[in-house]
Regions:
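Short histidine-centered catalytic/ligand-binding loop motif
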Residues: 82-87
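Basic, often amphipathic N-terminal segments
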Residues: 1-69, 73-76, 88-187, 195-213
């Protein structure tokens, strides 16, 4: 949260920040923007949340905690500063367990927008996509950052804030070492999403309790 505030303050001269971790998304009152690593995103109705929660809880019982090693900061293509973690089989196992349990409940539905606010229908309708692997994963999972047998697109990261002016790039050199974010991922959670991929409305969290392989 401190790093999010540091970056958001630094964006004040270039349009400001869309959100700060630990605070509600501006204009919403459904909870603070929680620091998180996105494992999966899906579209469901409010009446189906309990079913999804039960699926995620079941997945958590099948996999072990993850040693999360933060390795670098960098901007995403929309200028949002993010801290990235080393890809690992432990991370992949957790993501695959969650998707195996929850994705069938998607029932083919596609989210309206990606975290940057871009319509996903346009990505799927493009006859000449720039990123065919992304399109394939969106059609298969409704999510395009998946580690599967064809493409390893899962790149664990935390989005620290998001610039209002997406052409700007805040300086990342004053930040604490990325390694300071390293730790142990012991729980998965289910959240409702706000703009820019933020997690605001909390539905539950579950400890990873599976036996080591």
């Amino acid at each position: 949260v401190a790093t999010s505030n540091q970056l958001a303050d630094a964006m004040s001269d270039s349009g400001g920040a869309a959100f700060r971790l630990g605070r509600p998304f501006p204009g919403r009152d459904d909870g603070p923007c929680e620091p998180h690593i996105s494992l999966f995103m899906m579209a469901v109705d409010a009446t189906e949340v309990a079913e999804v929660a039960a699926a995620v809880a079941g997945a958590a019982r099948t996999v072990t905690p993850v040693a999360a090693s933060a390795v670098e900061y960098r901007h995403n293509h929309e200028g949002a500063p993010e801290v990235f973690f080393a890809r690992s089989d432990e991370f992949r196992a957790v993501q695959r367990a969650v998707i195996a349990a929850a994705e069938p409940l998607r029932r083919g539905r596609i989210r309206e927008l990606d975290p940057g606010g871009n319509p996903l229908a346009a990505v799927l309708d493009d006859p000449n996509p720039k990123d065919p692997a992304r399109v394939r994963q969106l059609r298969t999972y409704g999510f395009d950052d998946v580690s599967d047998d064809q493409d390893d697109r899962f790149n664990p990261h935390v989005t620290l804030t998001w610039p209002v002016d997406e052409t700007s790039r805040v300086d990342l050199t004053p930040l604490c070492p990325a390694a300071d974010f390293s730790g142990r991922l012991t729980d998965v959670a289910l959240y409702g999403m706000a703009p820019n991929g933020t997690c605001t409305r909390r539905y539950g969290s579950w400890t990873l309790t599976g036996d080591p392989v």
